[in-house]
Amino acid sequence: MKKIIATLLLLNTYTAIQAQKLESKIPNNVDVLVSANAENLFKLIKVSDIDKSAIGKEILKDLNRSNKTYRVESVVESESDEKKEDSKEIEERKKVSSVANAGIDIKSNAYYFFSKTDSISYHNFYVELKDRELFESMLSKRNKKKIRRMEGYNIIEGRSDIRIWNDDYLLLVNGDVSRGYFSTHKERLDKLKEEKEYGYSFRKRIGKGWTKKYVLDLFNKNVISSIASNTKFQKSKKKNASATLWVRNYGMLMTDLFKSFGSSLYPLYADVGDQNIYGVEEVTANLFFDKSDARILLDMSVSPDMKKSFKKIYNKRMSRDLVNSFDHDKALAFWSISIDTEETLKQYPELLNKMYGGILPKFQEEMEIVGDLFSLVIDEEAIGRLITGDALLVLNDFSKKEVEYTTYKYDEDYKRKEVTKTKEEFVPDFTLMIGSKEEDLLNKFFKLGEKHKAVEIENNVVKFKTKKSDIPFNLYSVVKNDVLYLTTSETNALSIARGNNNFNTKKHSKLVRDNSTVFFVDVNAVLNKIPNKWMSKSEKEAMRFSTDNLNDGVFRVSRMRGNTISSELKISTQGTEENTLKLLLEFINAVAK
């Protein structure tokens, strides 16, 4: 038994080491990192599934386009700068029949990472190679001629990108210089310009030099501190996730983005400094392909100085009056939001100063005054009673309606005459519900509207007087049980006014009340309502496939837990395939036909 346990531990350790081979070559100070987990992906699909898919066929088509006889004129350079010509004929290979036969090890993890300095940012792609010569044979004829053979690596230099590889790894890097840096350090950098060299070509030349040095250092030197030892990144990777996104500090990333614009383009942002302008720190996301649903889970950490405000605004449960105000089983789609209006208004001045004061530091004092005046003028409690912060928009149905529109007719003398015509339009039937504890005030407002002939009131139902040319549907309103209703259905409005609301309200009650925001759509039901006579062949095929295979989609944002706000996007299917990744490939195949 001990030997078995020891063997299992050894295998587990080996697997972990293999998975972290490339991670140990990625610096710990990267700002954004996306990792594709090959082990989890190939538990879901086979290489042959990719080869047979529309995506795989396109990849193979491109690979075979370059897969012909060619002559390589390569230069081998040593540390002593000795050069010798090495010319050899490469025989024509057989047609590539699988994406696994392109030299890249597709069953090893792949990584994209973004790193930056104050002068330049780098987009990096790192993968493992299975066969260097095979990989090189897949390059275009032009790129094959650009290969430079160095001691320990091979390199192709493009205009702003560099490819470097050896027998084991391939690194692709694209450098993007900061205009802001060149503006700030113009006097010093201008001394490096060559004769008759203009701004764009100068920036490209300098940026290319920086990029090459960065690439050679990254590829050839051992990374002292790698992302493999970063506990936050390692913790962000969830079990069974096919891919993981990790952002070190979103707020600081956006700050640096503003700074990179430069004072010449965005003078207001010139002095942003090193402030986290949005108060959002670490962001992580994980992608899952399960049997009957595909999911993206996202976690967002809020900075300590923003946590207090966010918690007061978002930690509110939606009123049951709203949750129980529609039939959960019949809704085609709905969007809900629940925030504390009173607390939002109270926190607004401080948030205004922290967020926009950081973006526009030159106007920080003005921001503070605006915030103070806002607090002085606004009665947060009164507005919080008028609009509680609970809102629900429900799509009930779609219908065909004849609507008027204006066009022009020309007589024999080419004089224009306005003509009113009618056409059939596909319009939504919806209900908007807004929480309010000021029923009397709202009814007074509608009475005033009736006095000025803007609305009609009958049986406690308010009908807005609108031109059919402005909106293609009628609009009705009812105030009942601390809820303001706006609906396109007169029948629905009368039912609400009479209190005849025997709805099924169990299906989504927990989902809505446990989250600050929810967007739900019954994909199948919505698609069955949409006419397809004007759709293209591919659109009809996409619609047919979706109707046959999808159930519903949900996007939700949780209330704050600690200093974290979590969200989830989930697409549920009918489970017709082994997993949703296979279903995704089938969908692409169907649309691509």
Summary of predicted features, one role per range:
Residues 1-26, 560, 564-565, 573-581, ...:
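Bacterial Sec-dependent N-terminal signal peptides
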Residues 20-143, 151, 225-416, 588-593:
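Structural boundary/hinge residues at secondary-structure and domain interfaces
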Residues 34, 86-227, 384-514:
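Single conserved position on a long alpha-helix in the C-terminal lobe of the eukaryotic protein kinase
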Residues 151-158, 295-303, 460-469, 484-488, ...:
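Generic recognition of long tandem-repeat/solenoid scaffolds
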Residues 155-163, 208-258, 328-343, 466-478, ...:
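Short, conserved secondary-structure transition motifs
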Residues 161-166, 273-291, 390-396, 400-402, ...:
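Broad, structure-driven detector of short, well-ordered beta-strand segments within folded domains
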Residues 177-190, 252-254, 271-275, 360-372, ...:
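Extended, charge-rich low-complexity interaction segments
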Residues 497-593:
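Long, C-terminal catalytic modules of enzymes
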